[in-house]
C-alpha cells in the first residue's frame, strides 16, 4: 500500500521569500493545485483565537491560503463555528468582532469571514457518519457543508483534554455547531480535588452551563453533573490543577466522537489540510490567555491525508526538545513527576490522545503510515 505523503518545510527563510510565500510554495508542492476550485465555494476552516489569546495563527497565513484559492479560480471564505462557553465567540456577532480584533478582516485575509452555524449556533445540518460507532448523524455548521471544497488550516498545539489540538480537533470539534459540540462532550464530567481547590471561582466564571457550584461552608467548588456539558473549559481555567477528568473512558469517547465528526465534514468532496506547528502552547486557543510554548517552533505541514498530517505533527513534536520555562518543562523538573516519555501527556497528565488517531484510522479517515517530503 502506498504511503500517504505529508509535505513539510521549516520556518527558516531566505532573502526575498517570507513565510507566507513559503507557505504558498509548500501547499502548491503538496498538490493543492490538483483540486478543481474554478467558481467553487471554498471553506477555509481555522480558529480565530479567543480575545486575549495571542497563540493563534497570524492572519498572514490565512491570506496566503486564500490567495492560492483565488489563483485557482475559487471563492474562499474563512470560517468557524460558535462555542459552548462564555467568551467572545459564543454567537456570530461577538465571534466576528473577536476575529476582527485579532486581525482577521476581509482586508487582511483577502476573503469574507463567515460563522458557519449562524447567529446563535443553531444553523446546522445533520450529516450521516459512514461507519460511525458513536455518532449516527453529526451536527455540522451549515455554511461548512454548503462549501464545494474544504480546507483546514490548523494551529497544532497542546490541549488540556485531548493532549493535542491538530487537524482532527480543528475539524471535528470546530465544525460542530453548538449542539454538535455538546454531543461530542456528553460523556465527560470532570472531578474537583477538594485538597487542591482554593475556592477562587475562576472555573465558575468560565462555565456557560451552571456546571460548577460554590459551597459556602467548605469554600470549595463542586461539579453539578446535571448541568455540566463536559467541555473541559474549567480544567484549563484552574491554576491549581484541582480539576481533571478521572474517567479516561469519557476522554477516549470524546476523541472517537471528534474523529467521527471529522469524517462527516470531509467525506464526499475535495479536501486539503495544512497544519502549522508554531507557538505550541499547552492549552487550546479557546482560552483568553496562552501560556508559554512547551516546544520550539517546528514548521509547516500539508497533506491530502489529515490523519497522516496529525501523525506527522505528533512525531515531529515527540522528537523536539521541551522548553524549560513552560508547563511541560516545569512538570519534568518536579522530583516526584512520573515521566510518560510523551510530551503531550507530560504536559497535561490527565489528557489522552492516542485513541483519537487509532479510531480515525479504524473508520477510514486516512493512514498513520506516511512519507515525509521535505521542502527546502
Per-range role (PLM):
Residues 2-53, 57-61, 68, 72-80, ...:
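Extended, low-polarity segments enriched in aliphatic/aromatic residues
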Amino acid at each position: 500500500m502506498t504511503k500517504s505523503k505529508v509535505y513539510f518545510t521549516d520556518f527558516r527563510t531566505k532573502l526575498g521569500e517570507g513565510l507566507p510565500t513559503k507557505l504558498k510554495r509548500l501547499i502548491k508542492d503538496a498538490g493543492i493545485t490538483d483540486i478543481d476550485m474554478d467558481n467553487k465555494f471554498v471553506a477555509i476552516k481555522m480558529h480565530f483565537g479567543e480575545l486575549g489569546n495571542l497563540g493563534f495563527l497570524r492572519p498572514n497565513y490565512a491570506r496566503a491560503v486564500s490567495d492560492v484559492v483565488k489563483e485557482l479560480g475559487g471563492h474562499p471564505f474563512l470560517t468557524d463555528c460558535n462555542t459552548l462557553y462564555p467568551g467572545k465567540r459564543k454567537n456570530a456577532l461577538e465571534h466576528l468582532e473577536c476575529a476582527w480584533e485579532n486581525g482577521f478582516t476581509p482586508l487582511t485575509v483577502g476573503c469574507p469571514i463567515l460563522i458557519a452555524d449562524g447567529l446563535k449556533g443553531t444553523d446546522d445540518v445533520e450529516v450521516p457518519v459512514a461507519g460511525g460507532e458513536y455518532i449516527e448523524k453529526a451536527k455540522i455548521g451549515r455554511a461548512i457543508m454548503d462549501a464545494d471544497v474544504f480546507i483546514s488550516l490548523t494551529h497544532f498545539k497542546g490541549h488540556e483534554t485531548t493532549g493535542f489540538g491538530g487537524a482532527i480537533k480543528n475539524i471535528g470539534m470546530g465544525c460542530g455547531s453548538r449542539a454538535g459540540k455538546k454531543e461530542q462532550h456528553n460523556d465527560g464530567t470532570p472531578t474537583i480535588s477538594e485538597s487542591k481547590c482554593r475556592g477562587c471561582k475562576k472555573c465558575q466564571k468560565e462555565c456557560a452551563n451552571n456546571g460548577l457550584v460554590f459551597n459556602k461552608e467548605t469554600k470549595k467548588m463542586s461539579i453539578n453533573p446535571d448541568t455540566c456539558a463536559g467541555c473541559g473549559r474549567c480544567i484549563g481555567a484552574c491554576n491549581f490543577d484541582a480539576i481533571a477528568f478521572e474517567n479516561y473512558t469519557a476522554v477516549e469517547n470524546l476523541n472517537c466522537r471528534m474523529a467521527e465528526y471529522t469524517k462527516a465534514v470531509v467525506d464526499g468532496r475535495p479536501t486539503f489540510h495544512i497544519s502549522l506547528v508554531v507557538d505550541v502552547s499547552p492549552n487550546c486557543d479557546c482560552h483568553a490567555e496562552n501560556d508559554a510554548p512547551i516546544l520550539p517552533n517546528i514548521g509547516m505541514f500539508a497533506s491530502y491525508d489529515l490523519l497522516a498530517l496529525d501523525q506527522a505533527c505528533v512525531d515531529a513534536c515527540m522528537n523536539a526538545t521541551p522548553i524549560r520555562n513552560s508547563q511541560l518543562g516545569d512538570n519534568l523538573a518536579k522530583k516526584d513527576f512520573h515521566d510518560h516519555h510523551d510530551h503531550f501527556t507530560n504536559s497535561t497528565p490527565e489528557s489522552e490522545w492516542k485513541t483519537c488517531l487509532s479510531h480515525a484510522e479504524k473508520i477510514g479517515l486516512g493512514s498513520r503510515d506516511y512519507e515525509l517530503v521535505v521542502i527546502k
